Amino acid sequence: DRSLVGSEMCIRDSYWIACIRECFEECGVLLAYRENGNLFGASDTEETKILASYRDRLNNGEPVLLELCKELNLKLAVDRLAYVSHWITPKMEMKRYSTRFFIALAPSDQKAIHDGSEGVESTWITPENAIKGGEKGNFPIILPTIRNLEAIVGFTSTNELLENKIKCQSEVSSIEPKFFMKDGKMIG
């Protein structure tokens, strides 16, 4: 439904919309604009209850994003996302995925809260500290996450990072790691 993003939709937009849906489902942040063009933030208790209800329904597998946008007169803020990478699970894996990664500038008046299912714990941390924490074994961190974090180390602000990545979106290519046996160990 083109009314969801307020512009001509193309196949590419479906990934941006899916990213916004996942963000809302997994951490409760909804990237959207109000009818007046302002960035959405739940402005009262009633809107907060509506959001919680839709998030619960989304977490139960109901496709409710369009319904939510219509009820609150919202347009998804696809322009606040930048496409960072596209990872494809190696052929040797039984379950394969084709996953696109994005970055976004979170609205200042929305609080991210993990869903307790896909995300069971959350913290704000710099990319450098996330990489170090993973290396030390403080928390699990997988190869795509490590590489995505390495790609954003060195930016001085989220705005700078977002602007840079928006300019480079056409340069994103697919990554499919290759693994092989060497000296009895799987390496890639």
Language-model features: locations:
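Single conserved hydrophobic/aromatic residue that forms the stacking wall/gate
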Residues: 1-6, 10-11
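Residue-level markers of secondary-structure register and packing in elongated scaffolds
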Residues: 29-32
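Short, well-ordered alpha-helical segments
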Residues: 19-20
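Nudix hydrolase/Nudix homology domain
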Residues: 8, 41-42, 46-188
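Short glycine/proline-centered loop/turn elements that form peptide/ligand docking sites
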Residues: 35-37
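Hydrophobic alpha-helical positions that pack around
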Residues: 23
